[in-house]
Structure formats: C-alpha cells, structure tokens
Amino acid sequence: MSIIRKEVIGGQTLILGDCLEVMPTLGRFDAVVTDPPYGTTQCAWDAAIPFAAMWGALASCIGPDTPVLLFGSEPFSTLLRASNLRRFKYDWIWDKPKATGFLNAKKQPLRGHEIISVFYERQPLYQPQMTKGVRKQTFRGKHLQTDVYGEMRGDYAYDSDQRYPNSVITFSSDTQNSCYH
C-alpha cells in the first residue's frame, strides 16, 4: 500500500495516496464525497480513474445506504453515471460564480457549473436545507362555486416562505486575493 502522507486536521484524517489501494483498508464510510480527475485536459495528473476499479475499491467501504457523491464535468460525468446505473440516483448542478475555460472562450461557452452525481442503493439520510422563497397566497376552503369566481367560501392564507432545494445549487467559491503555490 502506498500512503504518501497522513495528516489530522480538525479531528479529520486526510490521507494522500492511491485511493484504489488505500480505500479497502479504511473500513466503512458514512458518506463518500470526492472530486476525482476527469481526464479532460492534457495535464499528466488528469487521468480518469478506471470506473470498474473505483467501484470495486468502494464496495468494501460503503453500505447500501451510503451516499457516494462524485464531482465531474462532461463527458466524464456521463461515463461515470453509465458505469453504475443501478446505484445512480440524481445529479446536483453546482452553479459556480466564477466560470472556467477562458482559453477556449472563443470556441465554446465558459463552464459555469459542475455536476455532482449521487449514487446509493437504499435511501440514505436526507435532510434538505430549506431556502427562502416568496410567500404565496393560497385559497383554503371546502365550498367553491365558480363561473368565474361565483360564491366562494373559505379563506385566503399564506404558505410558508420556506422552499425545498432544487437540483441547481449555488455556493460562493473560496476565491482568495492572492494564491500561494
């Protein structure tokens, strides 16, 4: 096994190494959230992980209700979803405030979003983070006769302004005024 480096930060252990070798040694996870290389650039480090090997390594770490969230972009995300259709459930679309791909701006649109594909076998714990919306006026009542608003009994009420999240989420990026490399 090739663990290159291990650090504990804020009570969490971060391991730098080959995930295909390290994951099977770690036990069960409550969730897996990862941003693997997509294989979409010419960078030496940007080689897509072999999906069959990845799912094989994950098999020892996840249970049927363990959510696996994998960040990606096209065409990587399509191939990723197709690699495990049985467990694929849905995508989140991360609307990014800062687009990327400026070198290709004259050839194709800037990339202003990232795909987060969600996989699991059984429904895991889901606690939706409600968002604030507009309070809507609704009619509540039992008797309603209308030929364009003839006799109506009941009352108007306002629904909550809390809304369930949709599949497009926006988070600000951690942009720094200066970067250190």
Where are the predicted features?
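Core catalytic lobe of class I
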Residues: I3-H181
